[in-house]
Every structure is written in structure tokens, then in C-alpha cells.
């Protein structure tokens, strides 16, 4: 049985865009580099040729990976979700109980998780601690530096 990959509609669109870029822009550019490098003669000592072939291999591998993830995608339109209980797709505002610092995280699938963009994987320790909780609740998360406590200040669906 094929395992579905949960993702937001935004995450699906981002993967689709990357796939199109790799297929229609990167692939032809790499093929052109290979042809140009091949024209320089002896391939056994042609570093430019080997680098282009390696880039082609990497690109084709990523294309296959993207096609697989898109084929198995279980797209969830977060804007149609609601409720006070935190689940996949929720955007959660947390207050660190030690520092009073506010942070905002959206709980997404592993494929689209990116901490720099405020998106955490549903399988992360923080997301696992948040799932099923409501605004006003305090959660404790085991972090590399020890346990951290956060108050759930807001739950949004956007």
C-alpha cells in the first residue's frame, strides 16, 4: 500500500514549481553543458563533463523524488479547517515561559518543513507536544538543551 504524504496546498504548489523548474529549465541547461563538455574531447580526463554528468544525476534523482511525493500527496486545504484544537495545518503562536519570547509555527508535513520559514514537521517533538492541545494550555517539550515550556497563545487556520 502506498503511504500518503500529508501536505498543505501551498507545500504542494511549491513542490510542483520546483519540479517544473527542474524539468523545463535545469534539465535542458544540464544537457547543454554535457554536450559542450563532450565537444572538448577525451572524456576520461574531462572534469567539466564529469561535473555536468554528476549534476544531471542529482537533478534526475530529485525529479524522481518530487514526482513520487506529488503522486502520494494528501493535500489538505488548511483554510477550510477550523476549531480550537491543534492539528495538522494549524498556525500556533507560542510564548516561551522562560523568556516570554513569542514564536509562530505552522504544523506541516515532513516534505515542506522549514524552520526558517516557521514551518515545523508534524513528526517533530514540538508539533507532537502541540497536537490535540488548545489555546491557553502549557506544553513541555524536550529540547537539546533540556525541557522547555511554552504557553499556547493563539491557534489559527490560514
Swiss-Prot record:
Q: Does the keyword Signal apply?
A: no
Which ranges form a coiled coil?
Answer: 47-74
Tell me which PANTHER family the record gives: TRANSCRIPTION ELONGATION FACTOR GREA (PTHR30437:SF4)
The protein's role, per its UniProt record? Necessary for efficient RNA polymerase transcription elongation past template-encoded arresting sites. The arresting sites in DNA have the property of trapping a certain fraction of elongating RNA polymerases that pass through, resulting in locked ternary complexes. Cleavage of the nascent transcript by cleavage factors such as GreA or GreB allows the resumption of elongation from the new 3'terminus. GreA releases sequences of 2 to 3 nucleotides.
Q: Please give one Gene Ontology molecular function term for this protein.
A: DNA binding
Q: Which SUPFAM superfamilies did the record assign?
A: FKBP-like, GreA transcript cleavage protein, N-terminal domain
A GO biological process of this protein is: DNA-templated transcription elongation
Q: Which UniProt keywords apply?
A: Coiled coil, DNA-binding, Transcription, Transcription regulation
User: What InterPro entries does the database record attribute to this sequence?
Assistant: GreA/GreB_C_sf, TF_GreA/GreB_CS, Tscrpt_elong_fac_GreA, Tscrpt_elong_fac_GreA/B, Tscrpt_elong_fac_GreA/B_C, Tscrpt_elong_fac_GreA/B_fam, Tscrpt_elong_fac_GreA/B_N, Tscrpt_elong_fac_GreA/B_N_sf
Annotated signal peptide: none
Keyword Ribonucleoprotein, does the record have it? no
| Protein family membership | Belongs to the GreA/GreB family.
What is this protein's record name?
Transcription elongation factor GreA
> PROSITE patterns recorded for this chain?
GREAB_1 (PS00829)
